[in-house]
Amino acid sequence: DPLDGTKEFVHRRGDFTVNIALVEKGIPTRGVVYAPAKSRMFFTQADGQSVEEIGDFAKDQLGETKAISVSNPDNSALMVVASKSHRDQATDDYIGKYGVRDMTSAGSSLKFCLVATGEADLYPRLGRTMEWDTAAGHAVLNGAKKISPTLTLSPMHRALI
């Protein structure tokens, strides 16, 4: 997805991303999520581990990286990240079932990356979504050792992260 978070981009909010993914047999195996306005880039390495590039970005060489990992959440005090543009009553009702310590909004596939880094514990997405919007973030999340919830959906169509 060359521009995920179009509304955020148009309204000059920094939560848009550029996404690149490799999907093999329906499974997102490699992903890159770049948030240029936030100077953050996350990607899955060849060994499957996800990292965040930190420091100055150089177009000709990879900068310093750090491994990322999901949090070990306290289910009675979750940090929730939800969509700015696609939040609805069903999402609010779902969030209401959990003990929420704090909640933040973010746009684009950046939400996947906030869960992948442990900055958030839960990203509920109950509405329709497209593969090109989720594949890169899903791969980054998988590489951060996130175990996706068991749902009766294919790996590319999980509703809850």
Regions found by a protein language model. Name each.
Residues 19-113, 154-161:
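Acidic beta-strand-loop-alpha-helix segment within the catalytic core
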Residues 9-10, 104, 134-135:
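Short glycine/threonine-rich catalytic loop with a Thr-x-Gly-x-Asp
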Residues 1, 32, 124:
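Short aromatic-hydrophobic micro-motifs that form the base-stacking/packing surface
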Residues 1-24:
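Flexible, acidic active-site loops/lids enriched in D/E/S/T/G that coordinate Mg2+ and/or position polar
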Residues 4-5, 86, 129:
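Short glycine-rich anion-binding loops that position phosphate/pyrophosphate groups of nucleotides
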Residues 2, 82, 126:
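Short glycine-centered, acidic/aromatic-flanked micro-motifs in structured strand/loop junctions
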Residues 71, 92-97, 111-161:
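Oxyanion/phosphate-interacting regions
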